[in-house]
Amino acid sequence: MGSSATATTTGESTRQQPGLACEECRRRKARCDRVRPKCGICADSGRNCVVLDKRSQRGPKKGQLKDLRSRLMLLEQRLVGQNDAPSLPQERDSLGCPTPSEKVSPEGDLVSSRASTDIGLDTCMGSTAGAFALFGSTSGSDKMPPLTPDLSTASTANSMAACICKGWQTEPAMFSTSPFPQIPLTPQSTTAPSRMPSISLAAADPIMPDVRVHPFAPMVHKRRYYAWASDPNASPARTALRSAMRTIASAMSPQFCDIGHVMYASTRRMLETQDACPETGLPWMTRLKPPHEQRKMHHERIQAWLLLAYYDVLRKSEHQAFITARRAFRLLRLSGLCEMDIDAYSGRQGDVATCTPPAETTWNMQMCSSENGADEAVLQQDWISVEERRRTVWSAFLLDRLSTMVNDQPTMLMEEAVTKPHACTFSWYFSADLPISNQFYTRLPMSEAEFQSGTQEPVSQMGFLIEATDGIKASNSIQPLPPFAHCVVVANLFARCMTHCKMAMQSPPMSAPEAHDFWIRHQWLASAAANACESTETRCDPMLVFTRILAYSASLSLCSTANATSWQTLDHHLMAMACKPAAHQAASEVVRIIKTAPRIAFFKMHPFFPNAIALVTSFLNADVPYLPSTRGGNAMDAIQERQDAVNELLAALRRSSQVNNLAAELLCKLELDIGQAASDGSIYG
């Protein structure tokens, strides 16, 4: 085709012909000759030759569509809110949130004066138009759009930080050494804004204690929390607890995980501000004060620190979690909550009467109960507040005991102290006949149904930790324990097993008396762990599932301890080998629980759940399996079964790693260990 010859210029030619190619040639990716009114290809194929003179750009730049959607959401919300909240601009100015003229991403402006203070979804969605404005629906349908505003950009995080953190401030140089981001704050030192940056976070307050926090830290009375959660004038301790609730919920919610670090820094700064007082700001007591001069120690502060420690486990490092947990443990000691029921215990145990708590602890306990004499009688009858303080104590105790699973951390809250100085041997420590005085003079938590109902105080009182721990050994008092109390007792038993392991690993080859003491402790712990495994059905409670897995993990730890110790006699070696059948049976039960658990259950498990799974995985991967069925059968089937069990446990860790940083770290470590062992041929060869 002569007309398709390339255009020539003086001395040079161009590959690109002048004009635009037709749509048919573009679709075929063919070279169009640009002949008008119909090019050669269209003429040969008999198709219409269509040429678009004005063509749009290749596509929007990155983030333009999300920015446009967010602006439409903001515009529709403002149009709907003109009738419901005419004073929205004034309230926005009082919050100190950035205005559109400051060129900040509009997601940070999604704050409604009404929805930010309400705690219920029903209140926030009082009308259909309000629901459309809440979810940014522009189509008129009742469905939530699949696309949500992008919360990962730096401008969005900065605007949210400005909205979150306005409202509390300290002296500029007070926390200059803090490793957390320095956020500009206002002169209110111990309060925080009641309005959060995201309308969804404020609206989701009612489900946060139920779905996110309560399954592993049931220390808050839900109805009372709902009563003051929407109060803009809440006390500093309650404001910090509310912020900590939202922080831990953001860590366990994929849609809010991007703003969790900002909320964490804000909540931690708020708690540090409250701790910066003469009574609690120093790691020692400068002088003893009478009760009327001491400040009241609110248990909500301890609860907030505990939630931040769990956030560190989920999203930060283990080391940071232990640092944060120690802040809560120290406040717990200063408050005197560990001695709440010392009078009841002293009446039942005569040897406890000689153990008097420090003067400052007694005074703090009095101040924790009431601020004046007029309110003391009323608060003594408020059994719900007393039970909430008990649950705060045991939540801290549970966190301390489960911390021993990570890197052999020592316990910070001592369970008991021996009254006689010469009786401080570890073999006496586990003896049921030992005269001991429990330092935790606090009753175990009651059942969840009785606590949350709040109608009438239960007639029967719960027992104490030492009684329940001995009850596991006797297998006679573990049955009536509610899930939370049962988890506390089993966690204490697991911590004893870990201490038993440390004592065996640190000592040189045992002599005959030392070996005798070792097996006395070992048999006591093995019997208690076996009874704990058989005591409670898992049902659908995440706390019960975790407790049972923890009890099985204790049996595995005892087996590993017995087989890792060098024995001088054949009898002791045979006793160590006899522990393997029970240990492998426990590992099989853990795998069965993991297989039958629904996928959603992994998002409700305790933050330390990955440690128990990793312990079982390491046991199956490192130890030669006890295979009674292979004596006359095929050993390869049993080895393949063990590989399938390891893969099932790794899959559970992989699911938990979506919301748990500890699970991701343990998964990476186990995969490296398994790969190295497989390459060396020491396991599956």
Curated annotation (Swiss-Prot):
Molecular-function annotations in GO: DNA binding; DNA-binding transcription factor activity, RNA polymerase II-specific; zinc ion binding
Function text: Transcription factor that acts as the main regulator of the gene cluster that mediates the biosynthesis of sorbicillinoids, a diverse group of yellow secondary metabolites that restrict growth of competing pathogenic fungi but not of bacteria.
Protein name: Sorbicillinoid biosynthetic cluster transcription factor sor4
Superkingdom of origin: Eukaryota
Gene3D superfamilies: Zn(2)-C6 fungal-type DNA-binding domain
Species: Hypocrea jecorina (strain QM6a) (Trichoderma reesei)
GO cellular component, one term: nucleus
An annotated GO BP: DNA-templated transcription
SUPFAM superfamilies: Zn2/Cys6 DNA-binding domain
Localization terms from the record: Nucleus
Extent of Low complexity compositional bias: 1-14
Effect of gene knockout: Impairs the production of sorbicillinol.
Keywords linked to the UniProt accession: DNA-binding, Metal-binding, Nucleus, Transcription, Transcription regulation, Zinc
Main location: nucleus
DNA-binding region, residues: 22-49
Stretches for region Disordered: 1-20, 81-112
